[in-house]
Each structure stands twice: as structure tokens, then as C-alpha cells.
């Protein structure tokens, strides 16, 4: 698989995530550079205005890898710019993993979940992973594999509604269901089969696998 990673996540769990994938290209956004240092990782590209990362760490990496410096007074976040960079490449990845894109800033967390829409529209599998969740957005059929890491599977419409939802392999299966924005009917389902199939006719769907 051609996999790209943006930023990093914290504490012990980040190392587990970083070891789960064979990354072909690594992009660090601003403070994510500090995670690269902690894990002894050399990113292929560093993007940011560097208003968060420690100055000495940024300086040490400038001698080792490529940088794309951004203006502090820009319209888009560093992560948004990184995603645009990925999608502008002649050869796009099959899968993208974003780590460290959630946290105490709920505005950034919601914005980063929304940015998954760009990958969904290109048909690229993209996952936002933190210590408790694995989040993706899809515009088509999606398969969830059973794993001990995540107990719950929740489906949230990103568009006004997601129509014709069919679920197979779940505790709560469905056929022809409509998920509407502002309702919670898709929250806290569970897999009972090795794989769960999610199909729908129209809309954009957020799929959240949760640890607890």
C-alpha cells in the first residue's frame, strides 16, 4: 500500500500506530515534527508556519529534510495545506493516515474530520487515528474489520442525509435506512461478524470506530 502520514499522536499509543503501517511517505505538520523527533523518524516533508513546534527542533530538521514554510497569517490550517499538497501530486496514495489531528482544540478536531471529505471525494481511504478512535469518511461502500482495538462502530452523516443505508454483520443491521444530520440513530453499533459491510446510495458518511 502507498500510505502517507500527517503529524503524530501522543503518549505510548502513537508508537503502536506508527508501527502498524508501512509508510511510503511521511509528512510532518508543524508540532508533529516533535513527535518525529521522539520516535526517531525523518519525515520526507515538513509543512507549517511553525508557531507551535519548538524552534530548536525545527532548526535541527532544516538540515536534514525538505521544508514548505507557510505564512502565519494564512487562510488554511497546516493540515489543510498538507492535504492539498497530497492531492495535487501526480501519483496519489491509496491510503492516508492522519495522527495527532485531534486534541483539546475542538475547532481543530472538527475541522480535521471535515478535511477527510477531500479524500472521500477522490476515493482515497483516509483515517484519522488517536488513542481512542479511528475515523474515516466515505462516499461509497465501506468495510469495517473486526478488531480487539475498537468495540463500537458509529455512523454519522456529514451531508444533510445519507440515504439507502444497508448494514450487514452488525448487531444492529439495516436495509434502506436514511441517516439524517442532527439525529443519533447511527451511534454505538457493534460488529458481530468478522467484517461489517456498509453500503448506501447517496451522501457522505463518517465512520467512527471507538475503543471505549
Go through the PLM ranges and name each one.
Residues 2-13:
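Single conserved hydrophobic/aromatic residue that forms the stacking wall/gate
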Residues 88-91, 118-124, 160, 177, ...:
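Generic secondary-structure signature for well-ordered alpha-helical cores
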Residues 138-212:
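Long, charged alpha-helical interface segments
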Residues 107, 117-147:
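Class I SAM-dependent methyltransferase SAM-binding "motif I" and its flanking Rossmann-like core
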Residues 19-21, 31-121:
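Acidic/Gly/His-enriched mid-domain segments of enzyme catalytic cores or analogous surface patches
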